[in-house]
């Protein structure tokens, strides 16, 4: 999906995203107006297809990973998981699912495989 922000921000104004349904994450490339990459943002998600409605439901599992052009990797919003668990918004099963997906995502990020997985989507749409 190619997109523009409703209100351009100082950091970025547009991007492109690709959802890996079977793996449980969406990777987005955030860019400035001139096309310069600001960072890549990886949302860990749960996806559910409702056949009778022909509709996909995506649920954000809170923890995200940012990958900067320098190669620096930042895991963000981890504290939100504890808050959501304490308040009953998510259960232990969802936290386990999130941790398994985070582990697999970090494995492909640190190995560099994410670049090969996204190249065709980001290069042709950027």
Predicted regions and their residues:
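Cysteine/selenocysteine-centered motifs that mediate thiol-based redox chemistry or coordinate metal-sulfur cofactors
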Residues: 101-126
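A short, polar/proline- and glycine-enriched secondary-structure boundary/capping micro-motif
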Residues: 6-9, 52-53, 84-88
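Structured beta-strand/loop patches that form or line metal/cofactor-binding pockets in enzymes
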Residues: 17-63
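A hydrophobic, small-residue-rich beta->alpha segment in the mid-to-C-terminal subdomain
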Residues: 61-105
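Charge-rich, low-complexity N-terminal segments
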Residues: 1-15
């Amino acid at each position: 999906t190619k997109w523009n922000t409703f209100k351009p921000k100082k950091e970025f104004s547009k991007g492109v995203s690709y959802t890996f349904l079977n793996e449980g994450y969406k990777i987005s490339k955030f860019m400035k107006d001139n096309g310069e990459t600001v960072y890549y943002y990886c949302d860990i998600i749960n996806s559910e297809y409702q056949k009778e409605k022909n509709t996909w439901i995506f649920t954000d599992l809170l923890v995200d990973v940012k990958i900067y052009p320098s190669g620096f990797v930042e895991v963000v919003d981890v504290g939100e998981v504890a808050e959501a668990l304490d308040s009953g918004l998510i259960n232990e099963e969802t936290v386990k699912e999130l941790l398994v997906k985070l582990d697999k995502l970090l494995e492909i990020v640190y190995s560099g495989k994410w670049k090969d997985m996204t190249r065709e989507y980001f290069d042709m749409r950027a």
